[in-house]
Amino acid sequence: ESDGSWLSSYYSAEENSLKETNFSSYIAVGLWHHYLNFSDKDFLEDFWPTLDKAIEFTLSGQTEHGDFFWAKDSGDWLDDSLKTGCSSIYMSLICYKKIAKELKQSDRVSQKQINSLKDCLQKKPQRFDRNWESKSRYSMDWYYPILAGVLNKKDSLKCLNERWDEFVVEGLGCKCVKEEPWVTAAESAELVLALSRLNLDEKAKELLQNTFNLIDEDGLLWTGYVFKDKKFWPVEKPSWTMAAAILAGNSINRFSPSSNFFNF
């Protein structure tokens, strides 16, 4: 969009004006990942104006407490913040700064803004889920601060161990929602990335192998498996699930220059 934002969807039958802050900034992560793989500086240069504008939009949603409003709709900020979304933004801002440094471009993100976000994620739980039901039942809220580098290793291990048994089903994978008998490939693969970041390689390999049990005869991953009913559900095999699995496999097997992407 002209203000640097990305709409939450582009294929809806209804008119959509919802612009999520973490969606807009996440282009930084994709661009830096691409650069680590291909060292294509021209590609970065071409996308710099788009990236810079996207980050400008996201930064406009940061509150005085350090967190980011989760979205803007019809020109107004929606008054709540997501732990997973803000963790994603944290990683995006770091990638943006790396790109700016590589291209010798002016950097609109101050370290103070990043530190403020990090401090909020670590010490101000009251800033998240202020006006809706807590998202803590979702596994992404558990492992994303680890995956995105918000927590140091000691705190990451503490966080990991505290809720491991709530979300991880032995021999199957990671649940998407704590109380549901449903393991999902994308969440399992992302948790592999978090484990790899902490150098918990054996645990990561075991979880990745369990994730691959969701592969069908065509070599594609089902979204998830309802172990209570012994059924794959939903009946879909989305590209983003496969992308998460490829990233997870790369973090363990080191088959591309970006294999340590989540270890910075």
Regions found by a protein language model. Name each.
Residues 5-7, 153-160, 177-187, 193-197, ...:
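CBM-like carbohydrate-recognition segments
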Residues 7-14, 69-77, 175-176, 225-230:
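Short linear capping/connector segments at secondary-structure termini
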Residues 21, 46-72, 76-95, 100-186:
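Extended ligand-binding clefts on enzyme/binding-domain cores
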Residues 36, 98, 165, 212-213:
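Amphipathic alpha-helical segments of tetratricopeptide repeats
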Residues 41, 65, 103, 218-221, ...:
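Short, polar/charged, Gly/Pro-enriched helix-capping and turn/loop motifs at alpha-helix termini
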